């Protein structure tokens, strides 16, 4: 049996070792003919490349989910021109708005079929900024709204997957998620720190919003069977040509650009990690974190007796933060 992330021995994040990992391309015989997929944040960068490569593998219907429909339509027009037999649609979802996320998930219920969803929308901000829901914007987009959308999609993915196959849900994560440290005393809350301006440090705060999913997915996998929906996290690595760092300090951006030019993966390589996680690999990835095209350990804080406490704490705090839609009841509806 393939070990899952929780079965592996954690270690420090070794950036250059990861960037130089052997590329494992999508097998040439991979086909998604007849399938329907949802890709959020697919108007540019890795999301667009992933959408393109899925269509090249025969995808029949693609839902591009974006905050700005006009940008989505520009991307869709290029894809329609190249893949004329496929249906490419643009749907709006604003990850800064709970109402928008709920409306998008409700629209997904109208689809006849959904084979897999790839939640790729994310952002990095250089300065502390509160969004319309009252949370720091990276925390809102990268964690709270992403988890909300993931949970809302679970029942739909279970129902709409082809007969005999589980639904597939891949959440794009980051290697930086291996870096943050977390409190080790029972009284410390985890999520509120993400909204504390006095503790905001751009890159560390971004990494923290990504690391939270490591705790959450362990608990989710205890409740949702891989026979119903396979849920995993994937890190694409640092990729050339993406604009994720566009909001970073202008003094930092050139450094990131230089590192990308030296060690960055190509767009095709980065997008292949998404396709491996959502299409190629199977139920063995359920509840795991994929990095360098393989199942990888979580953030070190997930492990051990204190890790178990932290997993419970993040889970319960997340249930409370999203209690307005009773996500516990939704998860129970697809539980084993």
Report each predicted region and the residues it spans.
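C-terminal helix/juxtamembrane-tail motif
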Residues: 316-336
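Alpha-helical packing segments of well-folded alpha/beta enzyme cores
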Residues: 75, 213-216, 270-274, 314, ...
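Intrinsic disorder
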Residues: 66, 84, 95, 129, ...
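Mobile gating loops/cap/lid regions near enzyme active sites that modulate substrate access
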Residues: 247-254
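Rossmann-fold NAD(P)H-dependent dehydrogenase/reductase core
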Residues: 4-245, 328-335
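C-terminal helical subdomain
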Residues: 101, 257-298, 308-310, 320
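A recurrent short beta-strand within the Rossmann-like NAD(P)-dependent oxidoreductase core
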Residues: 169, 231-232, 274, 287-290, ...
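Short, contiguous pre-domain boundary segments
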Residues: 19-20, 296-303
């Amino acid at each position: 049996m393939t070990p899952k992330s929780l079965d592996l021995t954690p270690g420090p994040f070794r950036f250059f070792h990861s960037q130089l990992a052997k590329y494992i391309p999508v097998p040439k015989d991979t086909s998604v003919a007849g399938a329907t997929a949802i890709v959020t944040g697919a108007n540019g960068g890795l999301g667009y490349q992933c959408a393109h490569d899925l269509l090249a593998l025969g995808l029949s219907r693609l839902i591009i989910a974006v905050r700005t429909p006009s940008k989505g339509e520009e991307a869709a027009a290029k894809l329609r021109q190249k893949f004329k037999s496929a249906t490419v649609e643009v749907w709006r979802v604003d990850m800064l708005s709970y109402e928008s996320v709920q409306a998008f998930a409700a629209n997904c219920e109208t689809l006849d079929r959904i084979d897999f969803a790839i939640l790729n929308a994310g952002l990095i901000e250089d300065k502390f900024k509160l969004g319309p829901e009252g949370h720091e914007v990276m925390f809102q987009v990268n964690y709270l709204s992403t988890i909300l959308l993931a949970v809302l999609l679970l029942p739909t993915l279970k129902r709409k997957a082809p007969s005999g196959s589980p639904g597939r849900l891949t959440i794009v994560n980051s290697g930086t998620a291996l870096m943050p440290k977390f409190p080790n005393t029972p009284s410390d809350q985890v999520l509120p720190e993400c909204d504390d301006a006095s503790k905001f440090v751009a890159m560390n705060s971004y990494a923290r919003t990504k690391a939270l999913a490591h705790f959450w997915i362990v608990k989710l996998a205890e409740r949702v069977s891989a026979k119903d929906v396979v849920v995993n996290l994937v890190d694409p690595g640092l990729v050339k040509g993406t604009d994720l760092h566009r909001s970073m300090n202008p003094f930092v951006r050139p450094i990131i650009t230089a590192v990308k030019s030296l060690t960055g993966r190509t767009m095709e390589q980065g997008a292949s990690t998404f396709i491996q996680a959502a299409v190629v690999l199977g139920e063995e990835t359920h509840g795991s974190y994929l990095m360098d095209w393989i199942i990888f350990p979580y953030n070190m804080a997930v492990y051990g007796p204190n890790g178990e406490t932290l997993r419970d704490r993040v889970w319960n705090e997340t249930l409370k933060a999203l209690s307005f839609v009773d996500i516990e009841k939704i998860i129970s509806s697809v539980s084993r």
